[in-house]
């Protein structure tokens, strides 16, 4: 598809599609719902709307968002959930029993993901690959201890979810402009992977 620059642009353009699909990850976090991109509210009734393995990231919807959640869920033609908690939320607001499905990362085996990965090693020497979404000091301390024991370099993708200034001091390398194929390469070739991420764990 072409590149869409804003909500109005994508809203006008989606008439040319037979279906619009959203899915995986915590796209329906309370903080994401207000943007109306992942809710598919920009898609007209004439276009099919599909949600695959989408996660709410919470067990309950905040009271203030219940009306909005009920509205957008009932507009989506085909719903599925990644977690049991999401399945229950959908049932509560739509009355529908939806299937529990695998995250898309689990739909391919390692050989298929390997075909997508950047072919040549990005980091030549032995390394510990860190992919942290949270800001937990004990995780960083653990990585530093692992470095002492293994003498591996620390390679980390920094500032993924928030700016963490202290992270810049404990890493040896912090590649930027990492593509999905590069990410797979960094995971595949690491001696160790340290992560607090669902997808970091799955790909490891």
Where are these regions (language model features)?
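A conserved, positively charged/aromatic
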Residues: 70-74, 187
């Amino acid at each position: 598809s072409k590149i869409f620059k804003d909500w109005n642009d994508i809203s006008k353009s989606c008439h040319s599609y037979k279906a619009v699909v959203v899915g995986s990850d915590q796209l329906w976090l309370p903080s994401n719902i207000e943007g109306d991109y992942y809710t598919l509210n920009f898609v007209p009734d004439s276009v099919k709307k599909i949600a695959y393995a989408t996660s709410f990231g919470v067990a309950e919807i905040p009271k203030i968002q219940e009306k909005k959640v009920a509205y957008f869920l009932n507009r989506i033609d085909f719903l599925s959930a990644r977690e049991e908690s999401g399945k229950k939320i959908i049932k509560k607001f739509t009355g529908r029993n939806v299937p529990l499905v695998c995250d898309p990362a689990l739909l391919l085996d390692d050989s298929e993901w390997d075909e997508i990965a950047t072919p040549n090693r990005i980091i030549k020497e032995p390394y510990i690959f860190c992919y942290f979404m949270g800001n937990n000091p004990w995780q960083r301390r653990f990585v530093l201890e692992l470095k002492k024991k293994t003498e591996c370099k620390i390679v980390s993708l920094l500032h993924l979810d928030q700016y963490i200034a202290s992270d810049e001091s404990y890493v040896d390398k912090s590649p930027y402009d990492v593509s999905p194929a590069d990410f797979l390469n960094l995971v595949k070739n690491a001696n160790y992977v340290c992560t607090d991420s669902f997808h970091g764990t799955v790909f490891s």
